Amino acid sequence: MEQNYTKIDHELPLIPLRGLAIFPYMILNFDIGREISLKALDQAMMDEELIFLTSQKEAEVDEPGEEDFYHVGTICKVKQMIKLPGDTVRVLVEGVSRGRVKKIEQEDGYFRAVIEEIVFDSDNLDSETEVEIEAFVRNVFDAFEEYINIGNRVSPEILISLADIEDVDRFIDTIAANIYLKSSQKQEILEEFDIRKRLELIYSILLEEIDILKIEKKITLRVKKQMNKVQKEYYLREQLKAIQKELGEEEDINSEADEYREKLKKIKAPKTTKEKIEKEIDKFSKISSMSPDVSVSRNYLDTIFSLPWNKETKDKLDITKAKDILDEDHYGLEKVKERILEYLAIRTLAKSLKGPIICLVGPPGTGKTSIVKSIARALNRKFVRISLGGVRDEAEIRGHRRTYVGSIPGRIINGVKEAQTKNPVFLFDEIDKMAADYKGDPASAMLEVLDPEQNKDFVDHYLEIPFDLSKILFVTTANSLGNIPRPLLDRMEVIEVSGYIEEEKLNIAKKYLLPKQIKEHALKENFIKIDDETLRSIINHYTREAGVRTLERTIGKICRKVAKKYVEDPTLEEVVINKSDLETYLGKDMFKYQLAEVNPQIGLVNGLAWTEVGGVTLEVEVNVLKGKGEIVLTGKLGDVMKESAKTGISYIRSIVDKFDIDPEFYKTNDIHIHIPEGAVPKDGPSAGITMALAVISALTKRPVPGNIAMTGEITLRGRVLAVGGVKEKLLAAHRAGITKVLIPKECEADLDEIPENVKEKMEFVLVEHMDEVLEQALLKSGENNEN
């Protein structure tokens, strides 16, 4: 029945409203703050004070496009405009008539549209339709009257003015403006241009609202009957308040309790949790304000309501941007970055995915802690760091029970409270440094925290109610897995963060450390210039580490001296530091890189070892002396290493015939095995083949090439078994100038971790038996190393 409407075109400014809708003849005031709306309002005031108002589909959109708002709205006249503080304007408008957007364009920073004004024309109705509409109008009027009588929400006086309205469209709009409507219902009424359907729509909404009001009334009556006891309690509480006031007790416990009850309504928590909190509030309301228990109860409730029960940050699921952020902050660490990007990809597909629990293991200074900060930034999550180094008390994790004086929640709950979100990135730093004592074992408490199946109902001893930790992304760091209990390690996905090679350190120094230190020392960008050769010299002669922490401090030392020089001479434009200048800035070389012996040696073999700060080369020296068959082991060797040496000698006794060794050598000779740097403790089985080869070399007087190193455990039958830390050991061999390394065949997969530029400069020989080691490394007497 759109033919019963007159249509007139207007060109008007358009304002999209957020969460509001206006009907013709309705007066409404609202605040405008967006620039696009302010410009449209200014234009309307310059024209005929007419403006077109329509509703946004989604109120959250700050910069709407044409597709973000409805195309049917209301032409309005601006009645009043008041400027408020902070670039906000309060506007009073009156609806004139409905309109529909025919054409829209955005010019000069606001929307301008051709609006088709649509006005109902009752003259075109036939007599039958008029009768039907009149019947509808009466039904709607009666329903609206019943709505007013039941609800007591609208003044009955409106019925008088409604009875005088002859325009059916205005009749509908007036009712719509005075009843409770959802946003979708308001828009549906605005967009309906069939007068009969429009009457049907408002009538059905009124009947539905009447049914709801009747049910509300029943509920209200039922509740009032149950209120007698509550009113009695309220009366007694009011009397108690008066008594407390007379006694000078100013704190109004009950008003605080009421505030807590209001807060309880707003949190999203399981029913049992809310019931427990409600009991605590009731208990709090009955405590005298003079009682010492009141502060304990208040602190507990404040802690509960300060937790982010409902708050959660929205993840940025843009893999490309996340990769850019991770690459921007860190060089290398590809395994860690790849795992986070995989998690992001799966989160994009499965929104309910639980966060992985990752353990980053590697030497100090390799970027484990800082990469976790970058992970939080890439995911758009809050970051919380908890250091577990030296933690001995289980209560540090789970909190103290409230029976103790001064009890507080554990570090987990405090971290969540600090983050004010249910899904931060949580870093447990130095998880391998926890220890147990008589107060409990914190590692056992961590079992629940780091178990995705259990941590959704984590119970802190202080709170004594479950709190969901399942949406947190937990990352732990450690220098060694050896000190982490097996059940705890089993819950984590271990990613090894290896030490950096020289080339990686060079890139990190150039791209990250030097610019960072220049900025921290308030120097101009590129004020200090250090070439690659000089940086390599700093790396090799002033630091000895798997990470880059000492390297950063060393560069910082240079920056301090340059800053002093600049203050003394402000005319300096830049400072260029060459290799020859290092002694001036840093002093004499701190480390002389002990490159491998060039010439073959008898009884001297290069071994490889792994430490918590990375791989190192280890010289094994053997002397065979006339004696009584004693085996002397020096160099502060551990029990496993001593047993490994004895295993090697037993193996040698089984092969004396192959090398023309005196079968009684172990009776007539003392064998002295020494590993230099005697103050440093050494242990483990990985020097087994190294010690065995050194003893054979000393017994046979056959040299071993100085450019060869090796690692591997030996058995009594001469088999070579796998060892750990292969990547770190091979990088240490590369730093020492070794060109050939023997490793167990079982460790072949570890070669995939070795950078290509290292592989190009070194030869890796995979061995399964000691025979292969002897063939590769034992020269004939007087033979020189051909390599």
Curated annotation (Swiss-Prot):
Main location as per UniProt: cytoplasm
Keyword Cell cycle attached: no
Keywords: ATP-binding, Cytoplasm, Hydrolase, Nucleotide-binding, Protease, Serine protease, Stress response
Catalytic activity: Hydrolysis of proteins in presence of ATP
Domain Lon N-terminal: 12-210
Domain Lon proteolytic intervals: 599-780
Top-level class of the enzyme under EC nomenclature: hydrolase
GO-annotated molecular function: ATP binding; ATP hydrolysis activity; ATP-dependent peptidase activity; sequence-specific DNA binding; serine-type endopeptidase activity
One Gene Ontology term, aspect cellular component: cytoplasm
Binding site for ATP: 362-369
SUPFAM superfamilies xrefs: P-loop containing nucleoside triphosphate hydrolases, PUA domain-like, Ribosomal protein S5 domain 2-like
Tree of life domain: Bacteria
HAMAP family recorded: lon_bact
Family of the protein in this entry: Belongs to the peptidase S16 family.
SUBUNIT field: Homohexamer. Organized in a ring with a central cavity.
Name of the protein described by the UniProt record: Lon protease
Taxonomy of the source species: Bacteria, Bacillati, Bacillota, Clostridia, Peptostreptococcales
